[in-house]
């Protein structure tokens, strides 16, 4: 598949509109296209989320270190990516699926869907604080 590079939002939109009438689906990578991160390693956003989950667990009498939780997340996310790669080219993991699995592992029978919602909102807030719109080159 041939990929094109555009150096301004207007040129990207123009090309997208031109190609759109011939396609059912058009996709592009949002990150580094329209948005850039303020940090060099996007995985660094995951660390405060692991701390947040550890704090939530501690409130319920579950004592797991954030490093343990982060290790579990990495392993679960890696397994989900591996499973996706069997069917799709993108090797992406579905956030609600892997995060639900992680939270079930951490909280056991105390898990409920409101925890997933809480953690998702926290992670989105962390992610949003790291994003800025890309300026034209």
Residue ranges, per PLM feature:
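A metal-dependent, Asp-based hydrolase signature
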Residues: 45, 49-122
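Well-ordered alpha-helical segments embedded in enzymatic catalytic cores
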Residues: 12, 136-137
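Generic amphipathic alpha-helical segments used as scaffolds and interaction surfaces in large
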Residues: 36, 86-90, 128
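Generic start-of-chain signal for non-secretory N-termini
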Residues: 1-18
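Catalytic cores of eukaryotic secretory-pathway lumenal/extracellular enzymes that build
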Residues: 128-135
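Active-site neighborhood of HAD-like aspartate-dependent phosphohydrolases
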Residues: 13-71
